[in-house]
Structures are given as structure tokens and as C-alpha cells.
Amino acid sequence: MATSIKDVAREAGVSIATVSRVLNDIDVVNEDTKKKVLDAIKELGYRPNIVARSLKTQRTKTIGILLPDISNQFYPEIVRGAEDVSNIYDYNIILCNSDLDIEKEKEYLRVLKEKMVDGVIYMSSSLRDEILELINELDLKTVLVETRDKDGVLPSVTIDNIKGSYDSTNLLIQKGIKDIAFIGTKKDNMNAWGDRYVGYEKAMNEAGIKIDPELLYLDSIKVKSGYEGIQHFLGLNKKFKGVVCASDDIAMGAINALRDNNMEVPKDVSVVGFNDNFAASIFYPKITTVSQPTYDMGSVAMRMLIKLLNKKELDEPNYVLEHELIERESTI
């Protein structure tokens, strides 16, 4: 016969109401009592009736995670951090991949609402007005990762992308390199990838180096943009000694293009990336990059969301984590 909540209460020596409070993460239960209940649940192998509990509490203990590109190595580690925290608090996850398609994002948000998720972690480099409006319209408790809304209403977890790109550009400048190209996306308000162009621009301006518009290739953050960007510069017969890339994928594409044109990295051209994907550390040459604490971004975002769901005040609604510039073979 299946273990019941009464069995758990009897084993822990508490009331059924106390077991219910522990299951629903209500703060009035002290830590010693909570431990007794959790130990009893583990000992007896008790599995609560999710449907019955959701009908009673109006909560499903389910959180939706919406990410833009599951093939990008940057996002899975964020999901892992979020999932580890969700497991601690007994939340399930529904994972949605939009493939950088805003219409798919909208549809997934509607589906998550229909699934009665308790909240959403929204990952993207930017937050478009129509997505923000839909989140508000659907009344979805949401924490943003890698982006922020312009009014600062939704809680967010990011790094300082401007400072990260500034640091990587400045590394090349300190090595005496002045002809520095940039491959990424256009400057755009509230856009993490666009912020990386702003950081490049700021470092160049502060160093008194004029930016050559023909050494800008503003397309996407994918590998092909890195490859096509280098081919574009070479097609214009441009001379450059450094390339700042808005992602490690771009950097890998750029290095491959340079190699195909018989140019050595870093002997002929130094290349810096952004994100510190695993591939950046094993690519040849190993890529100098701005490392983001991706696991921490996911775990912090999930903790923030669970706090919101429990009607607790956030210590810091817009959390900015530290980045690290890691120098490897592509600039040494």
C-alpha cells in the first residue's frame, strides 16, 4: 500500500498539518521539525499527490525555463545551475527552446501559462517590448537571465557585459595593438550582445583609437559570423592585428577563417572571445575569453524566483555577477 501523509506524520511525530507546511515550504516550521519531516519522507519513500496538492495550493511546483538556443554551449550550464536549486526545493522544470524565434517564444509563454507553471526563468540577450507585454499580460512570475528590462521591474541576473568587452578590448590595446576589428551584433539598448559592442567602443575611445567602420561586422553571435566577418575584412583589403568577438563561437569561426587565409593566431592576429564555453579551452589555439559564471547565474535566478513565489522580498532584484578575463593562447 502506498505511503500516505498520515504515515509521514506518524513517523516524524508531528501533525499532518505540519507535514503539509513542510511540503509547501511554509516558513512557520522550525528547522529541526522540518528535518524530521524530510527524513521521514525519505525513509518511507513518500511521494505527494501533485495534482491534489496543486488543486489545494493553486501551485504546481513546476517552473518553466525558456532559452533562445539550446545548441549554444552557454545556456546548458545555466540550466544545470537552475535545476540543481529546483531539486533542493522539490520543483520540476519544463524546458523550452525558442531557436531565436520570437513567435516561438510567445507561443511557449502561452503554453507555460496553460500548464499553470508557478514561474518562469527567461533567458535571452535582449527583452523585446512585445515579450515583456506578454509576460505582464499572462501574469507570469518571471526572473530574467542575461538580459534586463529597461524599467527594472522584472528581477534579473546578468554580468556587466560592457565592462567585460571593455576589458577584453583593453587587453589588446595594452599589447600595443591599435587596428582592432569587432565581430558581433549592433549596439542596442538593454541587449547583452549589443553591450559588448559598447564595451569595445568605450575602450577604443578612451585609448584615443579611431574606430574604422569597415572593421565592424555586425551580424549575429554564431560561428558563421566569425568566419564571414574575417572574409569580409580581407575582401576589403583591411589591415588588422586584433579581433574582439562578442562570443566564443564567433572567435572560433574567426580563427578558422584566418587559418584558411594562411594567417596565424596570435602571431599575425590576436583574437578574444566572450562566454568561456568549454570549447574555448580546448580549441586550437585556446581562446582568450571573458568568463561568465553560468552555473551561478542559473542557481541565483532559481533562488530569486522561488523567493518571489514564497512572497519574500529579494535582497537584490537586479543581480550583477562578476566576470573574469582569462588569457590563453589566442592573444599570448
UniProtKB/Swiss-Prot annotation:
**Residue ranges of domain HTH lacI-type in the record:** 1-57
- Pfam families to which the protein is assigned, alphabetical: LacI, Peripla_BP_3
Keyword Transcription regulation recorded: yes
Please list the residue ranges the record marks as binding DNA. 5-24
Task: Write out the GO MF terms.
Answer: DNA-binding transcription factor activity; transcription cis-regulatory region binding
- Tell me which CDD domains the record gives: HTH_LacI (cd01392), PBP1_CcpA-like (cd19975)
Disulfide pairs here are none
Which regions span the lipid bilayer? none
Q: Which UniProt keywords apply?
A: DNA-binding, Transcription, Transcription regulation
The entry's function note states:
Involved in the regulation of amylase production.
Stated name of the protein: HTH-type transcriptional regulator RegA
- Which species does the entry assign this protein to? Clostridium saccharobutylicum
Q: Which gene encodes it?
A: regA
